[in-house]
């Protein structure tokens, strides 16, 4: 793969990463709001007021975002107190797959830019040598760009989901939803 191809692949990876990340994030957030809205317990005191406030705010968000109706009506409602939440977890994982794609594309883009600048610098030195200097094509033919896989993005693909799950567990436990 040439560095020009690597630059194009990097742009495609970044675009695909954002295209996967944004809908997955919106769907996950709406799923969590729907989970919070399904809670219909009769509590007393400040807990009842806070639960009613939460329901009103979620209903207001749904009413004021008609452009997100696709997500409001189709995002899976998780049940963390039991049951299978396969679709919710698949969509949740897609957030981090999108981030890993974007990170991989950003890394490839940086490398392609560095290689392009290196070729230009080397070309200047080769022209200073005169006739025995290498041409641009000869320099470019010697460059081997490694393939980048999203599985090497350790933080965004492996560590960040665990941090988000732990923070979500603490958040929902403190609010009494789990």
Swiss-Prot record:
It holds the Pfam family YniB. Its main location: membrane. It comes from the Bacteria. It is a multi-pass membrane protein. GO terms for cellular component: plasma membrane. The chain crosses the membrane at residues 15-35, 80-100, 158-178. InterPro entries: YniB-like. Keywords: Cell membrane, Membrane, Transmembrane, Transmembrane helix. It is found in: Cell membrane. The keyword Transmembrane applies. The keyword Nucleus does not apply. To Y.pestis YfeE. This is Uncharacterized protein YniB.
């Amino acid at each position: 793969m040439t560095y020009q191809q690597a630059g194009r692949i990097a742009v495609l990876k970044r675009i695909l990463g954002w295209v996967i990340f944004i809908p997955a994030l919106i769907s996950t957030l709406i799923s969590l709001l729907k989970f919070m809205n399904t809670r219909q317990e009769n509590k007393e005191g400040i807990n009842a007021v806070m639960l009613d406030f939460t329901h009103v705010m979620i209903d207001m968000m749904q009413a004021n975002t008609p452009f997100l109706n696709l997500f409001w009506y189709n995002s899976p409602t998780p049940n963390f107190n039991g049951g299978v939440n396969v679709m919710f977890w698949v969509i949740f994982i897609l957030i981090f797959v999108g981030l890993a794609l974007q990170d991989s594309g950003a890394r490839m883009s940086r490398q392609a830019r560095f290689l392009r600048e290196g070729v230009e610098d080397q070309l200047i030195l080769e022209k200073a040598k005169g006739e025995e200097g290498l041409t641009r094509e000869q320099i470019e033919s010697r460059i081997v760009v490694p393939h980048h896989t999203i599985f090497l993005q350790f933080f965004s693909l492996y560590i960040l989901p665990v941090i988000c799950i732990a923070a979500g567990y603490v958040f929902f436990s403190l609010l009494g939803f789990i």
